[in-house]
Amino acid sequence: RRQRQMCIRDRPNVAEAMNLIGDVDGKTAIIIDDMVDTAGTLTAGIKMLKDKGAKAVYASCSHGILSGPAIDRLKAAKLTGFVCTNTIDQTENQKNYPEMTVLSMAPLLAGLIHAVEENSSLSEVLAHAFDD
């Protein structure tokens, strides 16, 4: 059975309403987002999941802008784990939030560039992008 978090918002960086479909009581919740800017919506989702009884909450994003209050909000949210990529340099953010795991996009981008140069399959590169 799937648990799904849904967020409805009218403007960027403003969490207007949050609804949870499914039961997370006593379960591990994982939030996957494309981009985290100020982390307002993300931390509202984390709070909602914890309030509904999630035993652990992990979050990830592919693009961590992490501007303004984002790092302080993530620290205060006491996530079990937070993962993002280095599409934006995260060196300073990692110093301030060492619990954050940053995945390098360099091997994936290098593989894609190589595949284009060799006229080979991009799908094959993507299928094995994070095998390590």
For the regions a language model picked out, list residue spans one by one:
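PRPP/pyrophosphate-binding module of the type I phosphoribosyltransferase fold
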Residues: R9-Y97
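Short, small-residue-biased leader/transition segments that mark boundaries at the very start
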Residues: Q3-I8
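Generic structural microfeature
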Residues: R1-R2, L108
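Acidic, metal-coordinating catalytic segment for phosphate/diphosphate chemistry
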Residues: I71-D132
